[in-house]
Amino acid sequence: MLLSIVTGLNESKSRNEVIIKKFNDLCELLKPLHYDGIELSLLEPEKIEVRKILEVADSYAMKIPALGTGATYVRFGFSLGDMEETIRKKAIDRIEKYIEFARETESKVIIGLIRGRYKSDNSPKKEILNIIASLKECCWIAQNNNVELVFEPINQFEIDSYNTISQALELLKDVGSDNLKLLIDSYHIYLEEDPGFVWEDLEEIAHLVRHLHLADTTRRAPGTGHFDFKSFLEIFKKKGYNGFCSIETIMKPSFEEVARESSQYLRLIL
């Protein structure tokens, strides 16, 4: 398994030379800590000069395993499930920008918060249908660009739809696209899944998983809470998973400290 960590580049407010320097500094920090890649949480990927980012990544033998898209919903309010067709179209257009970036960086594109929250108690069924229809369109765009999308079940306190593994499996069936797979996050698993059955459930769906997010029960660095990462990761290792495990936590006391602490802990069990 490979290790990465989530961060942003503040590309919306920075010149390209500043963005490239920030990425270089991240690689310089993370490579000695035995990281294999950096997962980028972006808002406007089209503002980044991909060729230069790749030059830096290659010089450190680092990958960009996945792109986070949630900022599109948080900042702009665009979502795949919105009741307004114009808003859904804007969300799909934004996803296309991520896909174009991912095509060059060989990254996966994450479908998480961008599916949005329900606008009212009367709209859930319609918004679920909107999410499915929007995702079918996104999958078609991704397939034409040879990019894989990964869908993340997220806990009910952060989003209204598809909180559990079983619900995410239903979505995959409803969308019916070979290039839509799963992202499993240890923190959301801890909050949403039945602890008596979660390991069995993970074994059953491991073949559909293409990316992992790691955070402990406190949403801090792995090893600071009581989540059983050894058992969690062993399931995927046994199933032949050789992709990325990406640290996605509250970055306190600092990004550097979380990166160091997480690597020291996880390298003992990866």
What are these regions (language model features)?
Residues F23-E28, V50-L54, I95-I99, I132-C139, ...:
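Generic structural signal for well-ordered alpha-helices
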Residues K21-K22, F78-K181, L191:
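Active-site acidic/histidine proton-transfer and metal-coordination neighborhood
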Residues K47, V74-R75, K119, E152, ...:
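Generic structural signal for helix capping and beta-alpha/helix-loop junctions
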Residues N10-I20, L80-T86, N122, S161-Y162, ...:
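Gly/Pro-rich active-site loop or hairpin
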Residues M1-R103, S177, K181, H207, ...:
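N-terminal pre-domain/capping segments
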Residues E39, A66-G68, I110-I111, V150, ...:
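Conserved beta-strand positions in the central sheet of alpha/beta enzyme cores
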Residues V6-N10, S41-L43, T69-T72, I114-G116, ...:
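Active-site beta-loop-alpha junctions enriched in small/polar residues
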